């Protein structure tokens, strides 16, 4: 046996030859020292023990060779001296004051003892040292041995803790790649919290989340971080200032006179201009506005409504209506995946084995909610192994998610989405953009809804039959909602399902407890002998928000999840609508005053409001003429049969041809120049008609019968060319239109040139079809 290597327990120590003289070579003789030197050295050791600092090499060598008897005598002498000083302080305090200083002093000493590293024994016989940041570079007495703590990442105790083995080495060995080692005692574990200490270095700080811009969704909703809302609002402010120069100048003068300082003046003017109320009644405050005009005898119109837009319906002998799609939402949609944006790591434990001792194991490896990693570390003589090589090491940490740091996905059900449509008649009352008209009615539709009839008071009834379409592919759409932590951030976004499912974040389904792919927010450090650090990647909210730039924004109001893009196609029945005030007498022309002078609405129309001091109710005489043709009324009234009622009225909206015009309301007159081009207006209305027909898609055609095909063709013609036809021949009567169509068809039949013949025939047919048609 003398020639063989001997391994010590639990991996063994360095191999050595059994020799009778070996103990004499390694053991140092404890010779007698001067008593004064021993006392001075013991005071130094005591000082370092009280302050928690590391001892110098001289004191370490002294502690190893000092005779036990001399050390005990020196400590007893120090104890007697401290006791004498304590008694003297107590006596002096009792003579001068009644305050007992002994009790606070003892409490302070005991508290200091409690705050130092504590040692406890587990049921399996192992010892556990619980240390804190102040215990770094200190020795701890454990039974008959001592343990040295060299860890630098210790903080105050909390859930973010770390536990690993304190290796046992011999007196002659030097520690290698360990933060804790013991001599004279085995099976010791070090545990400490890491709160309050500085974060360690990480190779990465975020996960990789691709931008969502490559997966565009259909629809024209507001997009986050695109700047469109700011641009749109600045455009509105600019338009209002340009149309209200006098009011703007007055506002600037008032601010300049009432406020001192250049910067406050500028701020007040800018804020006031951003909040100024513009002329607004029903659809006039919306930029996306469309006009649909029915010909004489029209009883049914097909409208295309989209979020953020409005359609004004006008027809001969019928009151004008504003119809718009107000909201698209679903109550409490189903929840799909839930992602964690900020991990909370607690209870880290490490187990390690020497080479050839098998794999390291931890019970936490088989528990849910933990993240583990296996690796190999360098082991050898300086860290309690008899062989040099790679040893197994495993680290596990408990994973949970921080509060208010989750991103949840919700999916829509097509059958449960509600579309809210609002209808409002033109009553001649001025209503500001932030006010609600008393005659406004609402109707809600789903996929299974039938026809709805709305009662508009004195204006009769209007029927709505709508086919809903979301404007986005709901099967591939997920509403990504964040916990609301910052008021300036949006609440939710409409994202593509594939992008949502591919997010590199921990996730779980609704109701589940364990997180899948929890290791995506955890990083493990380089393995040391018996320790492997664990790092938290931190909050990933900023990375997610960056990837959402350009994504359509959704909104959540209570349990209602709103879509920000979509459209519906509605058939509006006008047969039961009736005009109000047809039997009123005409108002006295001399008693009108301007309440709001004519101004451009931004939709190629003119809006105004007049006051009346005569007897009510009555009909307002209003017309407009072009320069040089005073006998022809060129005004197309959007507000039909404007009246002055007992409790309101006087708001008028009309459309004028481009050029110089004069507006007459009673004896009032106003010079007005209408910007634009007649040809451009025709082309624009034709373009809008084509857009409406495109949105209608397959719903615009009925191939079930010959009559259905002819009806579909007529409806398509009215949809595409109705606006242009009304612009060109809107002021021409019914009979002249019939005669014009017949004349053009007759000319086409008698033309010898085939091209001209076909042109006249098509033109005459269109005029007759648009005049005699009953739907648009």
Swiss-Prot record:
Ranges in the topological domain labelled Extracellular: 118-242, 281-727, 749-755
Annotated stretches, region: Disordered: 1-27
Single GO cellular component term: viral envelope
KW Repeat (keyword) present: no
UniProt site positions, description: Cleavage: 96-97, 117-118, 205-206, 280-281
Comp. bias regions, Basic residues: 17-27
Disulfide topology: 283-310, 340-396, 354-385, 372-401, 466-570, 587-618
GO molecular-function term, one example from the UniProt record: structural molecule activity
GO biological processes: clathrin-dependent endocytosis of virus by host cell; fusion of virus membrane with host endosome membrane; virion attachment to host cell
Post-translational modification comment from the UniProt entry: Specific enzymatic cleavages in vivo yield mature proteins Peptide 2K acts as a signal sequence and is removed from the N-terminus of NS4B by the host signal peptidase in the ER lumen. Signal cleavage at the 2K-4B site requires a prior NS3 protease-mediated cleavage at the 4A-2K site.
Propeptide segment residues: 97-117
Intramembrane region spans per record: 728-748, 756-776
UniProt keyword list: Capsid protein, Clathrin-mediated endocytosis of virus by host, Cleavage on pair of basic residues, Disulfide bond, Fusion of virus membrane with host endosomal membrane, Fusion of virus membrane with host membrane, Glycoprotein, Host endoplasmic reticulum, Host membrane, Host-virus interaction, Membrane, Secreted, Transmembrane, Transmembrane helix, Viral attachment to host cell, Viral envelope protein, Viral penetration into host cytoplasm, Virion, Virus endocytosis by host, Virus entry into host cell
Matches recorded under InterPro entries: Env_glycoprot_M_flavivir (IPR000069), Env_glycoprot_M_sf_flavivir (IPR038302), Flav_gly_cen_dom_subdom1 (IPR013755), Flavi_capsidC (IPR001122), Flavi_E_Ig-like (IPR027287), Flavi_E_Stem/Anchor_dom (IPR026470), Flavi_E_Stem/Anchor_dom_sf (IPR038345), Flavi_Glycoprot_E_cen/dimer (IPR011998)
Functional description taken from the UniProt entry: Capsid protein C self-assembles to form an icosahedral capsid about 30 nm in diameter. The capsid encapsulates the genomic RNA. prM acts as a chaperone for envelope protein E during intracellular virion assembly by masking and inactivating envelope protein E fusion peptide. prM is matured in the last step of virion assembly, presumably to avoid catastrophic activation of the viral fusion peptide induced by the acidic pH of the trans-Golgi network. After cleavage by host furin, the pr peptide is released in the extracellular medium and small envelope protein M and envelope protein E homodimers are dissociated.
Protein name as catalogued: Genome polyprotein
